[in-house]
Regions:
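Compositional signal for N-terminal targeting/processing segments
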Residues: 1-253
Length: 253
């Protein structure tokens, strides 16, 4: 199997130096190169261009992509979060760009696999997605009505938002107990990270089994990188130390 080109390796090294981005190189049990690219879903235009060049160097790509038609409230969350990203891009005057995931999905060459497709969505993720939708459904009106926040008729909304805010303090405990099957009950939002980490790792294994000869890049949110790497290492993958890219020395005059 052909290795990733030196040019693509150098671009990946450049991605790893971008703020809030990460690149982890792994070797699958059969010796295949797999690069995990962790990104922010909204980024500076220059960062987006670098990530695009990195992804274009692969003919096999896997992406994080919440399955809206399978997840409770997915039909609400997807459009709302997408609208927020688009609004940020517009308000930045073109200085911000969207996710590399969308770039990968739109590439005409090669294969892009949505890794989170599954026959059965775990219950924890269903509850977590519904809970996130509840946060969005209450927080957005609260922000829009902020100028009238002192009005008595808004008191129930204020109480609900504060209650949800207090419950966020349970996230660290839920994350610490993430390996327990009941850990997500403490704070369902943790499943947006942990349960999806597991789905992503399983999707990567399926993708490599279906396409057994090509190196691959996997694009996920930056927060998913540690959990996905941990799960792949448990499946026999090996983490590769990043190569040092040496540039020619500049001769002084």
């Amino acid at each position: 199997m052909a290795p990733v080109s030196a040019t693509t390796q150098e671009v990946l090294s450049e991605v790893s130096r971008l703020p809030l981005h990460a690149v982890v190189e792994l070797r699958s049990p059969d010796g295949r190169q797999v690069f995990l690219l962790g990104e922010t879903h909204v980024k500076a235009r220059r960062a987006a261009d670098v990530c695009r060049r990195a992804v274009e160097g692969f003919s096999l790509r896997g992406v994080e992509h919440l399955q809206r038609d399978q997840v409770v409230a997915g039909q609400v969350l997807g459009p709302v979060l997408g609208a927020v990203r688009e609004a940020l891009e517009v308000l930045s005057g073109g200085g911000l760009a969207g996710s590399t995931i969308e770039v990968a999905l739109d590439l005409p060459e090669g294969t892009t696999v949505e890794l989170e497709r599954t026959d059965r969505v775990p219950l924890g993720l269903q509850v977590g997605a519904a809970y996130l939708a509840l946060h969005v459904a209450l927080a957005v009106p609260a922000l829009l009505l902020l100028p009238w926040s002192g009005a008595g008729w808004l008191r129930p909304l204020r109480v609900a938002v504060k209650t949800l805010g207090v419950h966020l303090y349970a996230l660290p405990l839920a994350y610490a107990l993430r390996d327990r099957p009941w850990g997500w009950v403490i704070q369902p939002l943790v499943t947006i990270l942990t349960t999806r980490d597991q789905l992503l790792a399983e999707g990567i294994l399926r993708m490599l089994e279906t396409h057994p000869t090509e190196p691959a890049v996997v694009i996920v949110g930056r927060a998913h990188v540690p959990g996905v790497v941990e799960r792949l290492v448990d499946q026999g993958f090996r983490r590769v130390a990043p190569a040092v890219v040496r540039r020619p020395a500049v001769q002084g005059g």
